[in-house]
Amino acid sequence: MVIKELKNAPTPLPEEDGTYKVFVDNGYAQNKIAYWAEVDGTKQLVNFLLPSRAQMGRVNVDVHGRASGVYTVNGSDYTVGEDVRDPETIRSKQYAHSEINCALVMHTLIAAGFSGLKIRLGTGLPFDHYFRNREVDKAFIKKITESLSSECISASGSEMPIIVSHRVYPESTAAAVAFSLDIDSGDFKTFENGLVVIDMGGGTTDITVINRDFTINID
């Protein structure tokens, strides 16, 4: 279910342990979020997107003069919003563990209704950023998970989501799994000749070859 108006976003549905599973595709052009919610009495996967636009400093205020869309990360202020006039350039590998990414991800989570809630977060990385020398780049991934545990404060007073776990996935590979998985049965489709995924994002294009046994060809 795709949500076009945030005011119509359904309430997130918790797991049995009280946590919430949520995935954020924190791309260069857009932040996409997906989570489980109850819609018309049934459990459905819902998603929506927000522009990845943020500017250093306190830029926007509401009609009452209060800072709007402002987040303080490790002592530095960032304004997040579709209408910021001078957005920061975020098309670099370092964006994934930057303060501005932390502000954008937290803004997206709060917009989805996760303020003050315990979440199990998944985020993505371009395929060639996830691997280094044919191995998972664990040091780089550690920087990302640590960056999203940075001190972040909303000027509006909104409670921050509580990230109890955070896993990072190669984006195009996650897309292959999502395409192949039957949500109702939990089974995977089979592909006689494997599967090729082309992920065209706001700043990167990933091509991933998935073999018949769902191993990844990293050549």
Residues of each region from the PLM?
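Nucleotide/phosphate-binding catalytic cleft detector across ATP-hydrolyzing
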Residues: 1-197, 214-219
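Ser/Thr-glycine-rich phosphate-binding loops at phosphate-binding pockets of nucleotides
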Residues: 201-206
